[in-house]
Regions:
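Amphipathic, small/basic residue-rich leader segments at the start of a protein or domain
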Residues: 1-89, 110, 114
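Long, well-ordered alpha-helical segments
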Residues: 16-26, 103-107, 145-151, 182-193, ...
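Structural signature of FAD isoalloxazine-binding scaffolds in flavoprotein oxidoreductases
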Residues: 66-75, 133-137, 186-187
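N-terminal glycine-rich flavin-associated loop
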Residues: 86-106
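A short, Trp-centered hydrophobic/proline-enriched beta-strand micro-motif
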Residues: 117-127
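Cytochrome P450 C-terminal beta-domain/meander region
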Residues: 133-151
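Flexible, small-/acidic-enriched active-site or ligand-binding loops
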Residues: 136-139, 156-157, 187-212
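A short core secondary-structure module
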Residues: 151-196
């Protein structure tokens, strides 16, 4: 089995490296990692407008590039190498993946074009204890007519204080363990959401707290 990059994947990797060498100097990284937002908005705009990395995993019929995880890894390796502070991980690795795996056709049609246009996304999963297993989901939901009511607190949400779109993991009231878990997606401007920056040791990956 051949694990080497293809010529196209090598080109993607090398193009990413050249872009990041030019735009992610140590000085720039230190400047923006100390801010509450945690990244340079102008850099994110250049990533979206010039590189179109936000479209990497999005199928072509939604306006994306329709590439795969090997191409994603090629870019992530370079982002890690140059400590690129950006909402790419939360938006693409988490948000887009959640939509592709679990989203309805209507949700994909609504939210994928927004992410392609530069809006940011993330997943809120961990409860106050910070675990990533199913038992750590502390937010509950119940159905009220045609709507759902969610209550709970999420901690250590990547870009949770700044993302435009939230994918929320919640458990139905009364359910235990892996039972009754659903994902909800909504704009962060939805009423009833309180968000705040949660400073952590690794300032290159901003975390937030989300309260419903």
């Amino acid at each position: 089995m051949d694990f080497k990059f293809t010529d196209e994947q090598i080109m993607i990797r090398d193009t990413a490296e050249a872009f990041l060498v030019e735009n992610c100097s140590s000085t720039a990284v230190r400047q923006f990692m100390d801010t509450e937002l945690g990244y340079d908005l102008n850099l994110w705009k250049r990533i979206c407008d010039q590189m179109y990395w936000q479209g990497l995993l999005v199928p072509e019929n939604y306006g994306g590039l329709g590439l795969g995880y090997v191409e994603l890894v090629a870019i992530l390796e370079q982002m890690g190498r140059y400590l690129c502070c950006s909402p790419f991980y939360g938006s693409i690795c988490l948000g887009v993946n959640a939509l592709l795996v679990a989203g309805t056709e209507q949700q994909k049609t609504i939210f994928l074009p927004q992410i392609l246009a530069g809006k940011t996304a993330t997943i809120a999963y961990t409860g106050e204890a910070g675990g990533w297993d199913s038992h750590s989901i502390q937010t509950s939901y119940k159905k009220q007519g045609d709507s759902y009511c969610l209550n709970g607190t999420y901690r250590f949400v990547p870009d949770g204080h700044s993302a435009d779109i939230l994918v929320l993991a919640a458990r139905e009231e009364g359910a235990q363990g892996e039972e009754g878990i659903s994902l909800f997606i909504l704009p962060t401007k939805t009423s009833g959401i309180t968000r705040e920056w949660l400073p952590t040791i690794d300032q290159t990956r901003p975390q937030g707290q989300v309260i419903l």
